[in-house]
Structures are given as C-alpha cells and as structure tokens.
Amino acid sequence: MDHVIGGKFKLGRKIGSGSFGELYIGINVQTGEEVALKLEPVKTKHPQLHYESKVYMLLQGGTGVPHIKWFGVEGNYNCMAIDLLGPSLEDLFNYCTRSFSLKTVLMLADQLINRVEYMHSRGFLHRDIKPDNFLMGLGRKANQVYIIDYGLAKKYRDLQTHKHIPYRENKNLTGTARYASVNTHLGIEQSRRDDLESLGYVLMYFIRGSLPWQGLKAGTKKQKYEKISEKKMLTPVEVLCKSYPSEFTSYFHYCRSLRFEDKPDYSYLKRLFRDLFIREGYQFDYVFDWTILKYPQSGSISKPRPNPKPALDPPGPSAERNEKPIVGQDLRERFSGAVEAFARRNVPSHGIRPKHIFSDDASKEVQVSEKTRNEIATKMAVMSSSQPGSSGELSENRSSKLFSSSAQKIQPVQETKLSARLGRDDGLRSFDMLTIGSGKRK
C-alpha cells in the first residue's frame, strides 16, 4: 500500500539517512512534482525538524533560500516537504578531484557571502557553515548557490528591538570543528563574525585542497576537538594563506578584528574578492570547474585563466573522513542535470556580454531549452550533516524561546500567491533543498 504524507505527498524510495532521520523522494499526487521528504521520529532524543521548519519560514523570500512546501506530523514522524536541489559544494569538490581553481572559488565567494549576509539580516546565525550546507540549484537556477540546514541556526538579535544576545563564555562547540572559528573553539558565544570566519576556512579548503588541521588522530571526540583547536590557533593566517592572493589574508584579519556585537562590512569583503577577480582577468560567466570537467568545450568559450597560485597540499581525501557511498547512482550521473544547464548557457547567442557581472539573480544569466530541462531526468537530494553530537546546546528549548506558536503544521504556500507577495518571479518556487545528516566531518 502506498504511503501518503500530509494527504498529498506519495512516499517514494529512500535516498539517505542520518542522525536526525531519513530522507525520501516524494511525489506530489496533485501535481506530479518531485519533492524531498525529510522524516524525523517524533520520539527522537533531540527533535529539531519542527524548529528547522520554522526557521525556513522566517527566511522565505531570500535569494538562495529554499522554499518549504509543507510540515506536519504523520503517524510517528515529523515530516517536512521541500523541493529537490542539485549537488552540494562538497560533492562538487570531490567531483573535481578535491581542488577548485581560483576563478571558481571567487565566483562562489561572492554568492556565499551574500547568503550569510541575508541570514544575518533576518536576525539569525547559521552556526554550521561548511561545503555540505551549500547546494547548487537545478535547471535555470543551476548556477545559484543555496544555503541549507538550519538545525543549528540561532537568533542573535530581536527583530523588533534589534537587541543583541549577550556575550557569554564556557559554551560547548556548536557546528563542525573543521570550520569552526577560533572564538568558537575558545567557548565564546557565536555572533556574526564567526559565520564569516568559518566561511573563510571553507574558501581556503576549496583552494588549498585541505586544511592543516584535517586528519588529526585522537582517542576521543573531545581530544580530537582539542587537537583541531590547538592546530588552528597555532597556524597563523599568513601561513594558512601562504602562496595565495593577499585578499584571503585580509579577509581573515578583518573577520578576527570584529568585536562580538559588530555588524560586519559585507560589502568590503565582497569587494576584496571582486577586485581580485577583475584583476586576474576572469569573466563572471558562471563556468565553474565542474562545468569544464563535464563539458570541456565550455572552457574554450569562457577561456578562464589557470590558477597562478600553487596548492600547498596535494588534493586527496582527508584521513579523517568517514563517508557513506552515494545512494542509488554514480557520482558523475548525479551531477549531469546541474552541469548540463551550466554548459547550455555558455553558447553565445546575443552578441558580446559584459565580462564582470556580480548578480545574485543568477537565473537571469542562464537560458535552458525545454530539451535540456527534459534531460534532467533524475534529481537527487543532497545530504549534509549537522550532527547533534557536536553541539552542546541541543538541550536548549530553542523553539519555545524563539517562537510562541505551538502549531504543528505549516500550511503549504500557494506558489502564485508567494510570487505576488514577493513582487517578483522568485524561482524559489521551483528549486529548493532537503538536508539530513549522513556523514560526520570534524
């Protein structure tokens, strides 16, 4: 007998699982649309799906923020329905043999900073910035980065009074140790500066191939965190960024200069990398490394310059990684739909285009034919992790502190109404995400 979630989503095959529950393909029985269904046992030790769904609702409308379709309780499970997205940046990093060019890193940096800035503008910290929690879209949104996984997100200020949360110490580590800021390791309450410092480590991870504190051995998780913390604090920024453009060093110095309640100058950080991008002579054409790898002819169109800076570490899997195999299909096949859209848009058809376009509305830069869209036959939800074992704050009743409503259901938003309310063709109506923990990264 077919299982139907919320009276409208037919439960399909299982495509992933993790510490917070299980991930399934679902079909909207009314429209035939594929969705991703995240199921969490009601009796789980640390329930977070209800909280996460409410954060999704509060962030709706932002570029690169997934659109939640439905949340409710079905039998013994909390359930959330959202659209499928393309691969995560961690998946694409592996696809590109664990090394990104400077051009790809800079194109990503512009969008990643924008995503973090938007969350902060809505009063939330992400607190688990890592490659797994950024996904590419599909089809016309294939060059747009989405920020996902709000299970550890925290409200850092009151939206009415703008009062900032108080400075505190002796906090347990929340997030992923590999990308955690130095202050987070020191037990200091996180604020906006910490999300941005974590993002800096993500960028260096991409361009270097690995970080100096990967692969450390320890007897216990606590000892491993301590080793990572020690190595991170003993690695000067100048050493971490050695042989790479000075803008990366400047990025870290700025983030670490911020005080606890300071509002970061996001424009300054984006300008650092945009100026470097222009100085290197790159074209902001959304031809990423994975585009060229899948469709080599796209590289001859954009003629990206090679990364002039040598990598400090040879690319290769970290010794500390313990990843599950990709479910159901080969890695390259999994990305074919997303990469296809990148390649299609690189055929010049409207004359000469400007070289430098820094725009969050990435969809305006992509033209995908109906044939191409039909070729995207299989869309995989990408799994990411936000492990409860790494957080010392899961005992906090975040949901009750943050939201007064105790309602168990979020009514599905009519897509036409959403578009009218936002006053634009949002695109989030068609390209969304689902995340569930599947592999620990420390």
Swiss-Prot record:
SMART domains the UniProt entry points to: S_TKc
UniProt binding sites for ATP: I15, G16, S17, G18, S19, F20, G21, E22, L23, K38
Protein name per its UniProtKB record? Casein kinase 1-like protein 10
Q: Which CDD domains match?
A: STKc_CK1_delta_epsilon (cd14125)
User: Can you cite an annotated GO cellular component?
Assistant: cytoplasm
Q: Which SUPFAM superfamilies match?
A: Protein kinase-like (PK-like) (SSF56112)
Compositionally biased intervals (Low complexity): 384-394
- Whichever gene encodes this chain, its name is CKL10
List the top taxonomic levels of the source: Eukaryota, Viridiplantae, Streptophyta, Embryophyta, Tracheophyta
Q: Where is the composition biased (Polar residues)?
A: 400-417
Q: Chief subcellular site?
A: cytoplasm
Q: Which family does it belong to?
A: Belongs to the protein kinase superfamily. CK1 Ser/Thr protein kinase family. Casein kinase I subfamily.
Q: Name one GO molecular function term.
A: protein serine/threonine kinase activity
* Record field: transmembrane: none
Q: How does it assemble?
A: Monomer.
Q: Which UniProt keywords apply?
A: ATP-binding, Cell junction, Cytoplasm, Kinase, Nucleotide-binding, Serine/threonine-protein kinase, Transferase
Q: How is it modified after translation?
A: Autophosphorylated.
Which stretches make up the Protein kinase domain? 9-278
UniProt cross-references to Pfam families, sorted A to Z? Pkinase
Q: Tell me the segments the record calls region Disordered.
A: 299-323, 381-421
Task: Give the UniProt subcellular location, in the record's own words.
Answer: Cytoplasm; Cell junction, Plasmodesma
Reaction equations catalysed: L-seryl-[protein] + ATP = O-phospho-L-seryl-[protein] + ADP + H(+); L-threonyl-[protein] + ATP = O-phospho-L-threonyl-[protein] + ADP + H(+)
* Biased composition, class Pro residues, residue ranges: 305-317
* Enzyme Commission identifier(s): 2.7.11.1
What this protein is reported to do is described as:
Casein kinases are operationally defined by their preferential utilization of acidic proteins such as caseins as substrates. It can phosphorylate a large number of proteins.
